[in-house]
């Protein structure tokens, strides 16, 4: 399989993971009362921040690889 295809697929996945975490954070911040299953808003946002940081770290890592 072409390395470029793999690299592009990984970038797309990590960008999607990052966008998902950022969207969740925006929802929690704009309407925390509407999220019934998350009584710990700080914990829920912290979890999404961790996901965002992890996705960004992966993006940075593959950008620096010698393909």
Cite the ranges covered by each PLM segment:
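Extended, charge-rich alpha-helical interface modules
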Residues: 2-67
């Amino acid at each position: 399989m072409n390395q470029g295809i793999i690299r592009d697929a990984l970038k797309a996945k990590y960008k999607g993971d990052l966008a998902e975490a950022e969207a969740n954070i925006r929802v929690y911040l704009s309407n925390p009362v509407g999220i019934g299953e998350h009584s710990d808003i700080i914990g829920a946002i912290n979890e999404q921040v961790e996901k965002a940081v992890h996705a960004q770290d992966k993006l940075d890592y593959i950008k620096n690889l010698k393909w």
